[in-house]
Amino acid sequence: MADYWKSQPKKFCDYCKCWIADNRPSIDFHERGKNHKENVAKRISEIRKKSMEKAKEEENMSKEFAAMEEAAMKAYQEDLKRLGIKPDDVGPSSTLNKTQSITAEGKEKKEKKEKKEKKEKKKKTREGTSESPKTEPKEWVQGLSPEGYTYYYNTKTGESQWEKPKGFQGNSKTSHTGSVWVEGVSEDGHTYYYNTQTGVSTWEKPDGFVSSSNDNSQRGKHSEEADSRASESDSEQEDSESEGQSPGTNLKRKGENDEESEKEKSPKAKKLSPYGKWREVKWQEVKWQEEAVDKEKIALASKEASSDESKTDTYGKWKAIKNEEEEEPDEKVDLELPSTEGDSALPPVLDVPEDATVIFKEKTVTSLGDLTEGVPTFKKREFENGKSRNLRQRLDDQ
């Protein structure tokens, strides 16, 4: 681990405007000091002065506002005297009258809301009684067998029968059964019908099938008939209420109107299906789509083949590179550069014959010296007064 220098934490004193070591002993020592205590006393006195000044300013402002209000009330009373209006009418009694009027209006609004809620509850109870007889026939559901015959199935008891039960409303179901069959056109131009649930296709028109154009016209007719019947039922209800007819007839009429409204709502629910509308498909469009798919497959296969070929060569294919010197079309410009003939001159070449012989001087040593002189000796140093020269000596002056 490398050594590093860590600074001690410090604390800033707001009263003295100085930095102190951030530990308990140094802080206590600083707070016990005379200078710190004097600074704290000064700060407290300054805060007290400021608070006193603010209180005085508020008192002065309140006095000024009170004087302004008094002057305004005096001017207001003088204006009322000029106009001939009594000042009592504009006093606290007038405010009480206003509050009483506001409370009265609030009570009236509450009463109106309660009346509306009661009327809505009555309408809901009547609708519930009118819808009760309709729940019975909804137990039966219409269906188609694989052979194309219609049968009726009871959702509660689980019974199935070929005969139509009593009170069964098949008109609301016909739109659903018709939507199961889809109309199409073959290559020859003949129309055929395809069942989306069973997958059966027939050349003959199935029972209950309605084309898109006929369906729209029938819906328009149904809506017009429903509007006319609704207007007739409204007029009959008004007559019955005036004459005091029995409530049973009104309930029957409401039930019929509700049935018609359900018939009208059924095609709307069909429109809001999550899979969208059915569309007629022609064989030419199917062929074009198949051809486009085949072309895409061929293109993908060619791409895969090319990728395989490229994978075999890790470095890619070899390419021939041509070195073509680009000739500058512009004319050469004389830049008046210094001549380099002297610099580029070659050094002189010496003509040395190949057969020339080199002569070397020879020196011979006859003897290595006289060995009879004796053993070699070393000279000894001479000392002055028995002392070596390297030692520091005292001067005579001292």
From Swiss-Prot:
Gene3D superfamilies assigned to the protein according to its UniProt record, in alphabetical order: 2.20.70.10, Classic Zinc Finger
Highest taxon in the source lineage: Eukaryota
Biased composition (Acidic residues): 233-242, 324-333
Keyword Disulfide bond in record: no
Alphabetical list of SMART domains matching this protein: WW (SM00456), ZnF_U1 (SM00451)
Domain WW: 134-167, 175-208
GO process terms (BP): mRNA splicing, via spliceosome
Keywords of this entry: Metal-binding, mRNA processing, mRNA splicing, Nucleus, Repeat, Spliceosome, Zinc, Zinc-finger
Pfam family, one: zf-U1
Subcellular location: Nucleus; Nucleus speckle
Record's compositionally biased regions (Polar residues): 92-103, 169-178
Cellular component, GO, one term: nuclear speck
A GO MF term: nucleic acid binding
Segments of skewed composition (Basic residues): 112-125
Zn finger region (Matrin-type): 11-42
Composition bias, Basic and acidic residues: 126-139, 221-232, 305-316
Biological role: Involved in pre-mRNA splicing as a component of the spliceosome. May play a role in cross-intron bridging of U1 and U2 snRNPs in the mammalian A complex.
Subunit structure: Component of the spliceosome B complex. Associated with U2 snRNPs. Binds splicing factors SNRPB, SNRPC and SF1.
Name of the molecule in the record: WW domain-binding protein 4
